Amino acid sequence: MGNYRKLWWTLIGVLGVTFCLLGWFGREVYREAPPIPAQVVSADGAVLFTEKDILDGQTAWQSVGGMQLGSIWGHGAYQAPDWSADWLHRELTTWLDLAAQDEFGQAYAEISEEQQAVLRHRLKNEYRQNQVRDGVLVLSARRQMAVQQTAAYYDTLFGSDPAMQQTRKNFAMKEDTLPDAGRREQMTRFFFWTSWVAATERPGQDATYTNNWPHEPLIDNQPTGENLMWSVISVILLVAGIGFLVWAWAFLRKQDEEEPVAPARDPLTTIPLTPSQRSLGKYLFLVVALFGFQVFLGGATAHYTVEGQDFYGFPLSRWFPYTLLRTWHLQSALFWIATGFLAAGLFLAPIINGGKDPKLQKVG
């Protein structure tokens, strides 16, 4: 063990530093988390919804699959859109259309480029400005109307409106994804908050709470210099780290004085199987069964990209919606991998123990 003392201390040092960094960044994540307004009110002071409504909306969104169906802030599945980015763009374009009708009597697409530029400037000023004061977020009358119209789209999308059936198929959403109208309303409030976070600048900074994500030219949501710098640094550190490991393996490790000779016979075949090793057959059968289950689920999940609700004409989403199959597909992989590692450990234990089963090994 003495020969490896330096390596042990190196490992302990690396783990100590990395866990300190992990703890510090974990604290920063909570400290820098975007605020949830205690109240969202209209320009005349009427309460539109509260923090509890936003959190209840998050629960409603999670109940239909959460990150398995679409995404929030880019962290989920992209069979359906990123709801925060989609909501933001729809709300912005709705605001522009409302403003164009109010001020010029035409749709935004029909007014001149100069008029469009004026409206986009006002749009950016209204959306990027942090308007939370003492936990209260105030919406202008125009923005309130844009939010209501955007929410109406999501209410029909997650319901059973026949006009949205093709869109639901494109997104691999079952009919009546969220049946309760009250829950759909709560969910739209959560979606609004996620888009508000993506559009609103942090106090004292010129970047939003999501560091200008998603890309949205209408309000100049573009990658910051900090984004680009750390992206480049991350790639450089990754390549440099891999290069250092290769160099260390080639030049720093101790070379064997003589090349080891491969045995004429596999050493494992010279050791008779113990009772516990023979009983591992059920584990291996379970691994194969779970692996096959995962493969078939993967095929069915992938097929949702072709037919958003059906499987060769069979209404699969009615019984096994996309979010459920995708969840089972991922979970079955975890189960067969974990079972395989467990079986390997149980098989190797008697070999390490000199060809004898550890006490009570077969019982386990």
Name what the model sees in each region:
Residues 255-280, 356-360:
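Membrane-interfacial, low-structure loops and terminal tails that flank and connect transmembrane helices
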Residues 51, 62-66, 265-275, 315-321:
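Short linear interaction motifs
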Residues 1-49:
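Post-cleavage N-terminal segment of exported redox proteins
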Residues 1-7, 220-226, 269-280:
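Short, Lys/Arg-rich N-terminal segment immediately upstream of the first membrane anchor
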Residues 8-27, 61, 69, 210, ...:
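Hydrophobic cores of alpha-helical transmembrane segments in multi-pass integral membrane proteins
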Residues 31-228:
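Soluble extramembrane regions of membrane proteins in the secretory/endomembrane system
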Residues 33-37, 299-315:
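Interfacial/capping segments of alpha-helical transmembrane domains
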Residues 40-45, 310-324:
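Perimembrane loop-to-helix junctions flanking transmembrane segments
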